[in-house]
Amino acid sequence: MITVFGLKSKLAPRREKLAEVIYNSLHLGLDIPKGKHAIRFLCLEKEDFYYPFDRSDDYTVIEINLMAGRMEGTKKRLIKMLFSELEYKLGIRAHDVEITIKEQPAHCWGFRGMTGDEARDLDYDIYV
């Protein structure tokens, strides 16, 4: 699950392009097939979103949940790719983006009636 937070006025019109950037970055950075993760957009009203004073209304928070196992360099590459692509494709400055990768052990994941450590048919590798 990926969650993206931002001001409704800025985030709502960009949802489709943001999803495309995130899916492409996950594919290029982690070799995850496009569309494999759910993305939830939380479009907040200005009075519901207090962000740092030195950020613009473009301020966007991206939280990415992953099964643990990827190398530090792989995760850093993904983060830097997202910063770059968001600025290049959507005009959102890196200064206005916050990205958090949250990892949990495979046994803490549940999907398709099994836990992540029981899945033997993933079409991507979590140990990259």
From Swiss-Prot:
Annotated signal peptide: none
Protein name per its UniProtKB record: Uncharacterized protein HI_1388.1
UniProt organism field: Haemophilus influenzae (strain ATCC 51907 / DSM 11121 / KW20 / Rd)
Taxonomy of the source species: Bacteria, Pseudomonadati, Pseudomonadota, Gammaproteobacteria, Pasteurellales
